[in-house]
Design a protein with these regions (language model features):
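Glycine-rich phosphate-binding loop of ATP-dependent small-molecule kinases
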Residues: 1-235
Length: 235
């Protein structure tokens, strides 16, 4: 199963992607992590991308798509993937479809986490991320045990510059002005599901999995049935 997860900054997309990979036994491919790894390893595509990033320019689609498809060609991703942060445009989605077709694969589901803009702003204003592994915390909803320190690896927590002020407004403008058109693209392919992202994390996950099983026709005997209990202590 290959899944595209669509959501604005602050929608909980990264959190749900991680949970879905565990529940469904898939791999998680986050575009931001892919770029960081390519820069660190100084791959040929990574170095080409870095020249644009260093100039403050957008990385051309041909490089971004090539990096994603190269990773998806790894045998470790053959059983399925949750794509997080890619594609961002219809052009990227079309290029992804063509590349997957050459591999004999396809996108099965595109899931949209629907969260009101005002809620996104409230979430982002209190979001903090650890420097080591990008674990996410929130004041006051999900604070760390020790102020400013990641519970998992003890690294420093920081607030991204694009999570505040005009920067976050601009990123949301881009999402609701451009990326949102992906919904129409996948709707026309009958692959789109919409999920209320303005719920507890466990509730969002349970709703996503229910939709996936309905869409794909899986039952509890399928290898895609969740690998852990989804019973929530919330509400």
């Amino acid at each position: 199963m290959n899944i595209v997860l669509i959501g604005a900054q602050g929608s909980g997309k990264g959190t749900q992607a991680g949970l879905l990979t565990e529940a469904l036994g898939l791999r998680h491919l986050a575009s931001g992590d892919l770029f960081r790894q390519a820069f660190d390893e100084q791959t040929s595509l990574g170095m080409r991308a870095k020249t644009y990033v260093d100039r403050g320019e957008l990385v051309p689609d041909e490089i971004t798509v090539a990096m994603v498809l190269q990773r998806l060609g790894d045998p470790a991703y053959a059983s399925g993937v949750v794509l997080d942060g890619f594609p961002r445009t219809i052009a990227q989605a079309q290029a992804l479809d063509r590349g997957l077709h050459r591999m004999g694969r396809r996108i099965d589901i595109a899931a949209y986490l629907d969260v009101p803009r005002e809620e996104l702003l409230a979430r982002l204003s209190g979001r903090y991320i650890c420097r080591a592994a990008q674990h996410v915390y929130h004041q006051p909803a999900r604070p760390p045990k020790v102020c400013g320190i990641c519970d998992v690896d003890g690294s420093e927590l920081y607030q991204r510059s694009d999570d505040a002020g005009e920067a976050v407004q601009k990123r949301l403008d881009i999402f609701f002005g451009e990326t949102i058109h992906l919904l129409d693209y996948y709707q026309m392919q009958d692959k789109l599901i919409r999920t209320n992202g303005n719920q507890y994390v466990e509730q969002v996950l349970a709703e996503l999995l229910d939709e996936f099983h309905h869409q794909m026709g899986y039952n509890k005997h399928s290898r895609y049935w969740p690998r852990f209990s989804l019973r929530s202590n919330c509400g």
